[in-house]
Protein backbone atom coordinates (compact mmCIF):
# COMPACT_ATOMS: atom_id res chain seq x y z
CA UNK A 1 0.00 0.00 0.00
CA UNK A 2 2.79 2.35 0.88
CA UNK A 3 4.50 1.74 -2.49
CA UNK A 4 1.28 2.42 -4.43
CA UNK A 5 0.60 5.60 -2.47
CA UNK A 6 4.10 6.90 -3.11
CA UNK A 7 3.78 6.28 -6.88
CA UNK A 8 0.46 8.09 -6.98
CA UNK A 9 1.96 11.07 -5.15
CA UNK A 10 4.80 11.21 -7.68
CA UNK A 11 2.39 11.35 -10.62
CA UNK A 12 0.47 14.21 -8.99
CA UNK A 13 3.64 16.17 -8.53
CA UNK A 14 4.84 15.66 -12.10
CA UNK A 15 1.50 16.22 -13.86
CA UNK A 16 1.93 20.01 -14.39
CA UNK A 17 5.23 19.37 -16.16
CA UNK A 18 3.73 16.64 -18.35
CA UNK A 19 0.75 18.75 -19.37
CA UNK A 20 2.68 21.93 -20.14
CA UNK A 21 3.55 21.64 -23.86
CA UNK A 22 3.16 23.34 -27.25
CA UNK A 23 0.18 21.97 -29.12
CA UNK A 24 -0.61 22.46 -32.81
CA UNK A 25 -4.27 22.54 -33.65
CA UNK A 26 -5.44 20.30 -36.43
CA UNK A 27 -4.55 16.88 -37.72
CA UNK A 28 -1.05 15.61 -37.47
CA UNK A 29 -0.72 15.09 -41.25
CA UNK A 30 -2.56 16.51 -44.25
CA UNK A 31 -2.47 15.51 -47.93
CA UNK A 32 -3.15 18.11 -50.62
CA UNK A 33 -3.44 17.79 -54.42
CA UNK A 34 -2.91 21.19 -55.99
CA UNK A 35 -2.87 22.50 -59.53
CA UNK A 36 0.14 24.10 -61.11
CA UNK A 37 -0.05 27.89 -60.78
CA UNK A 38 -2.37 27.88 -57.76
CA UNK A 39 -1.74 29.46 -54.35
CA UNK A 40 -2.08 27.51 -51.11
CA UNK A 41 -1.99 28.16 -47.38
CA UNK A 42 -0.23 25.55 -45.28
CA UNK A 43 -1.74 25.82 -41.81
CA UNK A 44 0.18 25.59 -38.57
CA UNK A 45 -1.80 27.26 -35.72
CA UNK A 46 -0.49 26.49 -32.25
CA UNK A 47 -1.28 27.14 -28.57
CA UNK A 48 0.89 27.46 -25.48
CA UNK A 49 0.00 26.25 -22.02
CA UNK A 50 0.40 28.71 -19.12
CA UNK A 51 3.39 26.81 -17.82
CA UNK A 52 5.12 27.32 -21.19
CA UNK A 53 5.43 31.03 -20.73
CA UNK A 54 8.97 31.55 -19.61
CA UNK A 55 12.34 32.96 -20.48
CA UNK A 56 12.88 30.50 -23.32
CA UNK A 57 12.39 32.03 -26.77
CA UNK A 58 9.94 30.84 -29.43
CA UNK A 59 11.37 29.13 -32.50
CA UNK A 60 9.35 28.35 -35.67
CA UNK A 61 10.75 26.44 -38.66
CA UNK A 62 9.34 25.34 -41.98
CA UNK A 63 11.29 22.71 -43.83
CA UNK A 64 10.95 20.60 -46.96
CA UNK A 65 11.49 16.93 -46.25
CA UNK A 66 12.72 14.64 -48.98
CA UNK A 67 10.54 11.57 -49.07
CA UNK A 68 13.33 9.39 -50.43
CA UNK A 69 14.78 7.46 -47.46
CA UNK A 70 18.14 7.12 -49.20
CA UNK A 71 18.48 10.91 -49.45
CA UNK A 72 16.58 11.93 -46.38
CA UNK A 73 17.40 15.48 -45.48
CA UNK A 74 15.66 18.53 -44.14
CA UNK A 75 15.88 21.87 -45.92
CA UNK A 76 14.71 24.81 -43.82
CA UNK A 77 13.34 27.44 -46.18
CA UNK A 78 11.59 29.77 -43.67
CA UNK A 79 12.06 30.38 -39.94
CA UNK A 80 11.25 32.73 -37.05
CA UNK A 81 13.80 33.18 -34.30
CA UNK A 82 14.43 35.99 -31.85
CA UNK A 83 11.53 37.87 -33.35
CA UNK A 84 13.15 37.81 -36.79
CA UNK A 85 12.05 36.16 -40.05
CA UNK A 86 14.75 34.31 -41.97
CA UNK A 87 14.68 32.72 -45.43
CA UNK A 88 16.47 29.46 -45.82
CA UNK A 89 18.48 27.60 -48.42
CA UNK A 90 15.91 27.05 -51.17
CA UNK A 91 16.24 29.96 -53.63
CA UNK A 92 13.35 28.82 -55.84
CA UNK A 93 10.99 29.29 -52.86
CA UNK A 94 12.30 32.53 -51.39
CA UNK A 95 10.22 34.79 -53.63
CA UNK A 96 7.08 32.67 -53.37
CA UNK A 97 6.69 31.91 -49.65
CA UNK A 98 5.93 34.02 -46.57
CA UNK A 99 4.24 33.75 -43.17
CA UNK A 100 0.50 34.22 -43.26
CA UNK A 101 0.59 36.41 -40.12
CA UNK A 102 2.73 39.47 -39.79
CA UNK A 103 3.80 38.26 -36.34
CA UNK A 104 4.14 34.47 -36.20
CA UNK A 105 4.49 34.60 -32.41
CA UNK A 106 0.77 35.30 -32.17
CA UNK A 107 -0.12 31.61 -32.24
CA UNK A 108 -0.10 31.22 -36.02
CA UNK A 109 2.87 29.78 -37.88
CA UNK A 110 0.96 29.17 -41.13
CA UNK A 111 2.58 30.09 -44.46
CA UNK A 112 1.36 31.06 -47.93
CA UNK A 113 2.96 29.32 -50.90
CA UNK A 114 2.24 31.08 -54.22
CA UNK A 115 2.42 30.14 -57.90
CA UNK A 116 2.92 26.47 -57.28
CA UNK A 117 5.18 24.48 -59.58
CA UNK A 118 5.31 20.76 -60.18
CA UNK A 119 8.77 20.81 -58.59
CA UNK A 120 7.15 21.99 -55.33
CA UNK A 121 5.78 18.50 -54.77
CA UNK A 122 7.15 17.45 -51.38
CA UNK A 123 6.39 16.91 -47.71
CA UNK A 124 6.38 20.13 -45.72
CA UNK A 125 6.91 20.09 -41.93
CA UNK A 126 6.13 22.83 -39.40
CA UNK A 127 8.01 22.84 -36.08
CA UNK A 128 7.14 25.06 -33.12
CA UNK A 129 9.62 25.05 -30.21
CA UNK A 130 9.27 26.49 -26.75
CA UNK A 131 9.94 24.46 -23.66
CA UNK A 132 8.70 21.54 -25.72
CA UNK A 133 8.29 21.03 -29.47
CA UNK A 134 5.27 20.25 -31.66
CA UNK A 135 5.31 19.26 -35.35
CA UNK A 136 2.85 18.97 -38.19
CA UNK A 137 3.34 17.58 -41.72
CA UNK A 138 1.57 18.50 -44.95
CA UNK A 139 2.06 16.36 -48.05
CA UNK A 140 1.73 18.55 -51.16
CA UNK A 141 1.34 17.11 -54.65
CA UNK A 142 1.38 19.65 -57.47
CA UNK A 143 0.01 18.50 -60.83
CA UNK A 144 -0.64 20.08 -64.22
CA UNK A 145 -4.27 20.38 -65.22
CA UNK A 146 -5.34 18.36 -68.26
CA UNK A 147 -4.88 20.18 -71.55
CA UNK A 148 -7.96 20.89 -73.63
CA UNK A 149 -8.57 17.57 -75.42
CA UNK A 150 -9.30 16.96 -79.08
CA UNK A 151 -12.46 15.05 -80.03
CA UNK A 152 -13.14 13.37 -83.38
CA UNK A 153 -14.82 10.33 -84.88
CA UNK A 154 -13.56 7.43 -86.96
CA UNK A 155 -15.79 5.31 -89.18
CA UNK A 156 -18.71 5.95 -91.51
CA UNK A 157 -21.78 7.25 -89.72
CA UNK A 158 -24.23 5.09 -91.63
CA UNK A 159 -26.92 2.84 -90.25
CA UNK A 160 -25.54 -0.42 -88.80
CA UNK A 161 -21.84 0.55 -88.83
CA UNK A 162 -19.42 0.82 -85.91
CA UNK A 163 -18.13 4.28 -84.97
CA UNK A 164 -15.24 5.13 -82.64
CA UNK A 165 -15.38 8.37 -80.67
CA UNK A 166 -11.81 9.53 -80.07
CA UNK A 167 -10.64 11.79 -77.26
CA UNK A 168 -7.04 12.75 -76.55
CA UNK A 169 -5.39 15.27 -74.22
CA UNK A 170 -1.81 16.17 -75.11
CA UNK A 171 -0.94 17.55 -71.68
CA UNK A 172 -1.65 17.07 -68.01
CA UNK A 173 -0.22 15.13 -65.11
CA UNK A 174 -0.95 11.45 -64.96
CA UNK A 175 -3.08 9.60 -64.25
CA UNK A 176 -5.70 10.99 -66.65
CA UNK A 177 -9.22 9.61 -66.65
CA UNK A 178 -11.59 9.84 -69.62
CA UNK A 179 -15.37 9.88 -69.39
CA UNK A 180 -18.00 10.29 -72.12
CA UNK A 181 -21.44 11.82 -71.66
CA UNK A 182 -24.29 12.33 -74.11
CA UNK A 183 -25.40 15.91 -73.56
CA UNK A 184 -28.10 16.20 -76.26
CA UNK A 185 -30.28 13.94 -78.35
CA UNK A 186 -32.21 10.81 -77.41
CA UNK A 187 -31.59 9.40 -73.95
CA UNK A 188 -32.28 5.82 -72.90
CA UNK A 189 -31.88 4.17 -69.48
CA UNK A 190 -28.80 2.14 -70.33
CA UNK A 191 -27.17 5.08 -72.08
CA UNK A 192 -27.96 7.58 -69.33
CA UNK A 193 -26.72 5.27 -66.58
CA UNK A 194 -23.40 4.64 -68.26
CA UNK A 195 -22.81 8.23 -69.25
CA UNK A 196 -23.60 9.73 -65.86
CA UNK A 197 -21.59 7.23 -63.88
CA UNK A 198 -19.32 8.95 -61.36
CA UNK A 199 -16.76 6.15 -61.38
CA UNK A 200 -13.44 6.32 -63.14
CA UNK A 201 -13.21 5.35 -66.78
CA UNK A 202 -12.13 1.76 -66.23
CA UNK A 203 -14.78 0.97 -63.63
CA UNK A 204 -17.29 2.81 -65.81
CA UNK A 205 -16.45 0.44 -68.66
CA UNK A 206 -17.48 -2.63 -66.68
CA UNK A 207 -20.61 -0.76 -65.60
CA UNK A 208 -21.47 -0.15 -69.24
CA UNK A 209 -20.82 -3.73 -70.29
CA UNK A 210 -23.21 -5.00 -67.66
CA UNK A 211 -26.01 -2.99 -69.26
CA UNK A 212 -25.43 -2.89 -73.00
CA UNK A 213 -22.83 -4.50 -75.24
CA UNK A 214 -22.89 -1.78 -77.90
CA UNK A 215 -20.57 0.46 -75.81
CA UNK A 216 -16.98 -0.70 -75.49
CA UNK A 217 -13.59 0.75 -74.69
CA UNK A 218 -11.29 1.20 -77.66
CA UNK A 219 -7.57 0.57 -77.92
CA UNK A 220 -6.83 3.83 -76.11
CA UNK A 221 -8.28 5.12 -72.86
CA UNK A 222 -10.11 7.95 -74.60
CA UNK A 223 -11.86 5.76 -77.19
CA UNK A 224 -15.55 4.95 -77.02
CA UNK A 225 -16.88 2.41 -79.55
CA UNK A 226 -20.52 2.59 -80.62
CA UNK A 227 -21.53 -0.62 -82.36
CA UNK A 228 -24.39 -1.06 -84.80
CA UNK A 229 -25.34 2.60 -84.67
CA UNK A 230 -28.80 3.90 -85.52
CA UNK A 231 -30.66 7.19 -85.49
CA UNK A 232 -31.10 6.77 -81.73
CA UNK A 233 -27.37 7.50 -81.35
CA UNK A 234 -27.67 10.99 -82.87
CA UNK A 235 -26.60 13.81 -80.58
CA UNK A 236 -23.69 15.63 -78.98
CA UNK A 237 -21.16 13.63 -76.98
CA UNK A 238 -18.88 15.28 -74.42
CA UNK A 239 -15.52 13.87 -73.39
CA UNK A 240 -14.18 14.86 -69.96
CA UNK A 241 -10.49 14.42 -69.22
CA UNK A 242 -9.66 14.75 -65.52
CA UNK A 243 -6.98 14.20 -62.96
CA UNK A 244 -6.69 15.05 -59.27
CA UNK A 245 -6.44 18.80 -59.83
CA UNK A 246 -8.75 19.68 -62.73
CA UNK A 247 -10.56 18.65 -65.88
CA UNK A 248 -11.10 19.73 -69.50
CA UNK A 249 -13.83 18.87 -72.00
CA UNK A 250 -14.46 18.62 -75.72
CA UNK A 251 -17.61 17.86 -77.73
CA UNK A 252 -18.21 15.83 -80.89
CA UNK A 253 -21.42 15.35 -82.87
CA UNK A 254 -22.80 12.01 -84.04
CA UNK A 255 -25.29 12.15 -86.91
CA UNK A 256 -26.27 8.81 -88.41
CA UNK A 257 -27.44 8.70 -92.02
CA UNK A 258 -29.90 5.99 -93.06
CA UNK A 259 -28.10 4.12 -95.84
CA UNK A 260 -31.23 2.14 -96.65
CA UNK A 261 -33.14 5.31 -97.43
CA UNK A 262 -30.25 6.59 -99.52
CA UNK A 263 -30.22 3.29 -101.44
CA UNK A 264 -33.92 3.58 -102.19
CA UNK A 265 -33.49 7.14 -103.44
CA UNK A 266 -30.55 6.15 -105.62
CA UNK A 267 -32.54 3.21 -107.01
CA UNK A 268 -35.47 5.47 -107.88
CA UNK A 269 -33.20 7.96 -109.61
CA UNK A 270 -31.38 5.27 -111.59
CA UNK A 271 -34.66 3.61 -112.56
CA UNK A 272 -36.06 6.91 -113.76
CA UNK A 273 -32.96 7.61 -115.81
CA UNK A 274 -33.09 4.11 -117.31
CA UNK A 275 -36.76 4.53 -118.25
CA UNK A 276 -36.06 7.89 -119.86
CA UNK A 277 -33.15 6.37 -121.77
CA UNK A 278 -35.29 3.51 -123.08
CA UNK A 279 -38.01 5.98 -124.10
CA UNK A 280 -35.48 8.14 -125.93
CA UNK A 281 -34.03 5.12 -127.76
CA UNK A 282 -37.52 4.01 -128.80
CA UNK A 283 -38.43 7.45 -130.14
CA UNK A 284 -35.12 7.64 -132.00
CA UNK A 285 -35.74 4.22 -133.56
CA UNK A 286 -39.21 5.21 -134.75
CA UNK A 287 -37.90 8.44 -136.24
CA UNK A 288 -35.10 6.59 -138.02
CA UNK A 289 -37.55 4.02 -139.46
CA UNK A 290 -39.96 6.69 -140.71
CA UNK A 291 -37.26 8.92 -142.11
CA UNK A 292 -35.35 5.99 -143.57
CA UNK A 293 -38.16 4.94 -146.00
CA UNK A 294 -38.97 8.43 -147.23
CA UNK A 295 -35.34 9.39 -147.34
CA UNK A 296 -34.42 6.42 -149.51
CA UNK A 297 -37.26 7.09 -151.87
CA UNK A 298 -36.39 10.76 -151.96
CA UNK A 299 -32.79 9.90 -152.70
CA UNK A 300 -33.79 7.65 -155.54
CA UNK A 301 -36.29 10.21 -156.77
CA UNK A 302 -33.60 12.85 -156.76
CA UNK A 303 -31.73 10.83 -159.32
CA UNK A 304 -34.85 9.96 -161.24
CA UNK A 305 -35.12 6.24 -160.46
CA UNK A 306 -36.95 5.99 -157.15
CA UNK A 307 -40.56 5.35 -156.30
CA UNK A 308 -40.97 8.48 -154.15
CA UNK A 309 -41.24 12.10 -155.09
CA UNK A 310 -37.60 13.20 -155.22
CA UNK A 311 -36.22 16.46 -156.42
CA UNK A 312 -35.52 15.25 -159.90
CA UNK A 313 -38.37 12.77 -160.01
CA UNK A 314 -41.15 15.32 -159.74
CA UNK A 315 -44.54 13.62 -159.94
CA UNK A 316 -43.39 10.68 -162.04
CA UNK A 317 -41.90 7.48 -160.62
CA UNK A 318 -40.31 4.15 -161.56
CA UNK A 319 -38.43 5.61 -164.45
CA UNK A 320 -35.82 3.39 -166.01
CA UNK A 321 -32.23 4.44 -165.68
CA UNK A 322 -31.89 4.77 -169.38
CA UNK A 323 -34.28 5.03 -172.30
CA UNK A 324 -34.60 1.93 -174.44
CA UNK A 325 -36.68 1.09 -177.40
CA UNK A 326 -40.07 -0.25 -176.43
CA UNK A 327 -39.56 1.00 -172.77
CA UNK A 328 -42.68 1.56 -170.70
CA UNK A 329 -43.15 5.18 -169.73
CA UNK A 330 -43.53 5.93 -166.01
CA UNK A 331 -46.78 7.05 -164.44
CA UNK A 332 -47.39 10.74 -164.29
CA UNK A 333 -49.27 12.85 -161.78
CA UNK A 334 -48.93 16.17 -163.46
CA UNK A 335 -51.30 18.77 -162.16
CA UNK A 336 -52.13 20.57 -165.35
CA UNK A 337 -51.78 20.87 -169.02
CA UNK A 338 -48.80 23.11 -168.64
CA UNK A 339 -46.63 20.28 -167.35
CA UNK A 340 -43.44 19.93 -169.27
CA UNK A 341 -41.74 16.86 -170.60
CA UNK A 342 -39.73 16.80 -167.37
CA UNK A 343 -42.84 15.72 -165.44
CA UNK A 344 -43.59 13.03 -168.02
CA UNK A 345 -40.26 11.33 -168.18
CA UNK A 346 -38.71 12.33 -164.86
CA UNK A 347 -35.73 13.95 -166.55
CA UNK A 348 -35.03 17.58 -167.35
CA UNK A 349 -35.92 18.51 -170.90
CA UNK A 350 -32.40 19.44 -171.84
CA UNK A 351 -30.98 16.17 -170.56
CA UNK A 352 -33.60 14.20 -172.48
CA UNK A 353 -32.92 16.05 -175.67
CA UNK A 354 -29.18 15.60 -175.26
CA UNK A 355 -29.64 11.93 -174.49
CA UNK A 356 -31.89 11.50 -177.50
CA UNK A 357 -29.41 13.30 -179.62
CA UNK A 358 -26.58 11.10 -178.48
CA UNK A 359 -28.41 7.79 -178.35
CA UNK A 360 -30.84 8.25 -181.22
CA UNK A 361 -28.89 10.38 -183.57
CA UNK A 362 -30.16 10.13 -187.15
CA UNK A 363 -28.45 7.41 -189.12
CA UNK A 364 -26.29 8.38 -192.02
CA UNK A 365 -27.90 9.42 -195.14
CA UNK A 366 -29.22 6.63 -197.23
CA UNK A 367 -29.59 4.39 -194.12
CA UNK A 368 -32.50 2.17 -193.10
CA UNK A 369 -36.15 3.03 -193.03
CA UNK A 370 -37.53 6.27 -191.74
CA UNK A 371 -38.55 6.38 -188.07
CA UNK A 372 -41.06 8.91 -186.64
CA UNK A 373 -41.22 10.02 -182.99
CA UNK A 374 -44.60 9.17 -181.49
CA UNK A 375 -46.30 12.30 -180.20
CA UNK A 376 -47.18 12.49 -176.50
CA UNK A 377 -48.68 15.34 -174.60
CA UNK A 378 -48.56 15.88 -170.88
CA UNK A 379 -52.32 15.96 -170.48
CA UNK A 380 -52.88 12.71 -172.31
CA UNK A 381 -50.13 10.92 -170.44
CA UNK A 382 -51.37 12.06 -167.07
CA UNK A 383 -55.00 11.16 -167.78
CA UNK A 384 -54.31 7.79 -169.33
CA UNK A 385 -51.74 6.75 -166.75
CA UNK A 386 -48.66 4.75 -167.65
CA UNK A 387 -48.53 3.95 -171.35
CA UNK A 388 -45.82 2.63 -173.61
CA UNK A 389 -43.78 5.19 -175.48
CA UNK A 390 -42.15 4.11 -178.65
CA UNK A 391 -39.39 6.03 -180.30
CA UNK A 392 -39.02 5.54 -184.03
CA UNK A 393 -36.12 6.87 -185.92
CA UNK A 394 -36.76 8.13 -189.42
CA UNK A 395 -34.10 7.74 -191.95
CA UNK A 396 -32.86 11.00 -193.22
CA UNK A 397 -33.43 11.96 -196.81
CA UNK A 398 -30.53 12.90 -198.91
CA UNK A 399 -31.93 16.38 -199.09
CA UNK A 400 -32.06 16.63 -195.34
CA UNK A 401 -28.50 15.60 -195.04
CA UNK A 402 -27.61 18.32 -197.41
CA UNK A 403 -29.54 20.86 -195.41
CA UNK A 404 -27.75 20.06 -192.11
CA UNK A 405 -28.86 18.71 -188.72
CA UNK A 406 -32.43 17.72 -188.18
CA UNK A 407 -34.49 20.43 -186.49
CA UNK A 408 -35.94 19.87 -183.03
CA UNK A 409 -39.04 21.21 -181.42
CA UNK A 410 -39.49 21.38 -177.67
CA UNK A 411 -36.38 19.25 -177.22
CA UNK A 412 -37.72 16.36 -179.44
CA UNK A 413 -36.70 15.29 -182.90
CA UNK A 414 -39.25 16.14 -185.55
Swiss-Prot record:
Stretches of the chain found on the membrane's Extracellular side: 22-263
Molecular function as annotated in GO: RNA binding
Disulfide cysteine pairs (residue numbers): 44-126, 167-239
Secretion signal, residue range per the UniProt entry: 1-21
InterPro entries per record: Ig-like_dom (IPR007110), Ig-like_dom_sf (IPR036179), Ig-like_fold (IPR013783), Ig_sub (IPR003599), Ig_sub2 (IPR003598), Ig_V-set (IPR013106), V-set/Ig_domain (IPR052871)
Sequence ranges assigned to domain Ig-like V-type in this UniProt record: 22-141, 146-257
Annotated TM spans: 264-284
Compartment(s): Membrane
Topological relation to the membrane, as annotated: Single-pass type I membrane protein
Keyword Signal found: yes
Sorted UniProt keywords: Disulfide bond, Immunoglobulin domain, Membrane, Repeat, Signal, Transmembrane, Transmembrane helix
Membrane topology, Cytoplasmic segments: 285-414
Lineage top rank: taxon: Eukaryota
GO cellular component terms attached to this protein's record: membrane
Protein name as it appears in the record: V-set and immunoglobulin domain-containing protein 8
Gene responsible for this protein: VSIG8
